[in-house]
Amino acid sequence: MDGFANGTWSSPEDLCDDAEQKANLSALCSLLRNLSLEARPLLRQPRDLLVILLYGLVVLVSVFGNALVCHVVFYSRKMRTKTNVLIANLAVSDLLMTTLTIPLSASRFLLDNWPFGEALCYLAPFLQVTFVYVSTLSMAWIACDRYSVIVYPLRLRRLCPSHRAIACIWTLAGALSLPHAVFNRVVSLFTYRPLVRCQVQYPPPPAEFRKWLTLATFITQYVLPLTLTALMYSRVSYALWSRKALGATTREQQAWHTRSKRKSLKMLVLVVLCFAVCWLPLNVYHLVAHFRADDGPDRHNSSLFIFFHWLAMSSVCYNPFIYCWLNNKFRQGALACLTCLLHCTHRRRLHQSLMKPASLASRGQSAKRSSTLRSTSVGSTNKTTSV
């Protein structure tokens, strides 16, 4: 769930769009639109700068961190375990959301118009909701996989391979996200100047349809996957803290196996908790806004909505730090990648610095040759003239 899925546009114009469906207030709404558009360049300038700074920081950190996670997993064959491949799938989803939808979401807070065309008006909310579904479904699948490995280590594992699991996750996420793509429309608003907006137009009655779609998305995208994940991890925690490790012959081996699995479990649980905390305020905001009895204008507090939206989008940044903090192999792989990157950059700069004196020397020699040739030609010309 996010602003795309619900068509949230925190401005007086959108309040007017809701009001015009309920009462004949077109004159007042036209006045509100004109006043808001005239005052916006002055009133929103500090907020716009803050939006650009915060969302830009999210994009930079997420692109660097999630690309690093994908590199660590796919570069080393030892890191391509089933859990790590699903973690990389989660990183790919976060990376795609960062590059494809977060800039569009931020632009809706900054621009009066929708300059991206009708195709992106349909595609942007679909991709946004799909990527969130992929995140929650991936976390639930990882939890089920850990449950089958730790709670029943001697039982034949019946979960499908990682590539099939990823295909199932993306297919189910896309199917569940379809309702958020079919109702978007590019509409024209005529005030003192024409505007183009990407808005959601639900079938009648639109208010009721939006309520139940919001509730259904909240349950399938947030409540059910995270509840299943919590149940699986609670059972896994009980198993880890109450029995000895299988196959360990000494106390030191038992302690090492148990400590390793507990640390891995802490990492996965922290990833889920971080996601849940980041997305809970925005989901509650949508539910309260759509189910409140009094549908007044105070529910559209744009600054509050932007903060909740930014908090939800920032969830794409934290996982790489959690992996490097609680997983030694991830940390070693990330350090090796960064060391190689810095070393290659240093070698490139050193090569360029060594090439500069040589190029300057060659330029100096060519200049001397040209001046010598020029002086020789002048001397020969003077001799010819004197003769």
Model-predicted regions and their roles:
Residues 63-74, 102, 130-153, 165-167, ...:
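Cytoplasm-facing ends of alpha-helical transmembrane segments in multi-pass membrane proteins
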Residues 75-85, 146-165, 230, 234-267, ...:
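Intracellular signaling interfaces of 7-transmembrane GPCRs
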Residues 1-42, 191-192, 245-262, 328-387:
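Intrinsically disordered regulatory tails of 7TM GPCRs
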Residues 55, 72, 96-112, 125, ...:
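Helix-to-loop junction signature of class
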Residues 31-41, 109, 113-125, 129-130, ...:
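Loop architecture of class A 7-transmembrane GPCRs
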